[in-house]
Design a protein with these regions (language model features):
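Short, flexible loop segments at the rims of nucleotide/cofactor-binding pockets, characterized by
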Residues: 10-18, 90-94, 125-126
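Short coil/turn segments at beta-strand junctions that form active-site/ligand-binding loops
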Residues: 31-32, 58, 109-111, 145
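N-terminal/domain-start segments enriched in small and hydrophobic, helix-friendly residues
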Residues: 50, 96-128, 172-208
Length: 210
């Protein structure tokens, strides 16, 4: 009960601090989905999670780096009890099991996921880094999954590196059309298509913001 109240409080706080709004090009759905977005800050998954309709949030789990979220008791509580995150070790040598198996287990348990296929926060001048292969491997293992690109705009300026408090600016999470792995689609083709779909939602992409 306390965790649910905290989750609702976090969602409200994020919307108040960032002026967050969600723009949907696909219809919100309780179907198993993977929401994948651009990665500019540790607040990214909270932004996407907060932008989802309340009825969907309980079944949507963020995929997060274990080394960051297990540093202290508060972070461990938040990621486990409030956000119900799926923790992945970034260093393969530290992993006790395959990361894709862990994600498939979460999906098989009835969850949708939030993840960031760039693999690390983008601190470059490029709008989007190349995608890691994990997005394809998850799609290959569970081809029935729908993948939803989500472009987060302005969060890097709301939560700038080195600042203790967020700066109030308007943030937008734009949810694009769903896509699935094609029957004969290879890794490079799928990753390129998924990346292009996400980039098209940005102000710098071909499609522009919704």
């Amino acid at each position: 009960m306390i965790s649910h109240l905290l989750a609702a409080g976090f969602s409200g706080a994020i919307r108040a601090l960032t002026g967050a709004r969600a723009l949907w090009r696909c219809a919100p759905s309780a179907d198993h989905r993977v929401y994948y977005g651009n990665h500019v800050s540790h607040g990214d998954f909270v932004m996407i999670w907060s932008a989802l309709p309340p009825a969907l949030r309980r079944d949507v789990r963020p995929v997060a780096g274990a080394e960051y979220w297990q540093r202290d008791a508060l972070r461990r509580y938040l990621i486990r009890e409030v956000f119900n995150g799926v923790l992945i070790e970034r260093d393969p040598a530290q992993r006790k099991r395959d990361a894709i198996e862990t994600l498939c287990e979460a999906v098989d348990g009835g969850s949708s996921l939030i993840l960031f296929p760039e693999g690390t926060r983008n601190q470059s001048d490029e709008p989007l880094l190349p995608f890691k292969s994990g997005l394809y491997h998850l799609a290959h293992c569970r081809p029935e999954l729908e993948f939803v690109p989500v472009w987060i705009d302005n969060l890097a300026r709301v939560m700038p590196k080195g600042k203790l408090l967020p700066l109030p600016l308007l943030c937008t999470a734009t949810f694009g059309d769903t896509l699935r792995l094609g029957a004969d689609e290879g890794k490079e083709a799928f990753l390129a298509r998924a990346r292009a779909a996400l980039l098209a939602l940005s102000e710098n992409g071909a499609g522009g913001a919704a």
